Design a protein with these regions (language model features):
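Positively charged n-region of N-terminal signal peptides that target proteins for export
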Residues: 1-4
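Short amphipathic alpha-helical "recognition" segments used for binding
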Residues: 6-8, 120
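Amphipathic alpha-helical interaction segments
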Residues: 13, 49, 62, 93, ...
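N-terminal signal peptide c-region/cleavage motif recognized by signal peptidases
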Residues: 18-20
Length: 122
């Protein structure tokens, strides 16, 4: 599991740079993207989030999630239910059309920082 965090830390700067340079590009020579999609969510607070997901040829998945004014690269990790992505102390946990954002710095039993984020369907 630490390897996933190491990869996320190592490529975070490159991905943020790539994202800033072009919202369409996500290029790392070592990791070949298979598909990409962007989903908009409306959270219980009324905040709207735009999250971009990548699935890669090697089976990894990434999510680019806006947190405190920055785009953070999250890497998928083991989950008993749904898909869980982690970046530093943050966890972005999706289950079907819903998602929650947690910050481990707030404590193990703390409520989500953003909760009940639901996919906007057009």
């Amino acid at each position: 599991m630490k390897t996933g965090f190491g990869v996320a830390s190592a490529v975070l700067g490159a991905v943020v740079f790539c994202h800033a340079a072009s919202a369409e590009s996500f290029r790392l020579a070592e990791i070949q993207p298979k598909d990409r999609h962007t989903t908009k969510y409306t959270c219980a607070t009324g905040r709207v989030l735009q999250v971009t997901y990548w699935n890669t040829a090697n089976g990894q998945s990434f999510a680019l999630v806006p947190v405190k004014g920055q785009q953070l690269l999250f890497v998928n990790t083991l989950s008993a239910s749904g898909v869980k992505y982690q970046a530093g102390s943050y966890t972005w946990w999706t289950k079907g059309p819903r998602a929650d954002l947690y910050d481990a710095m707030n404590g193990e039993d703390a409520p989500p920082v953003l909760s009940d984020c639901v996919t906007i369907i057009r």
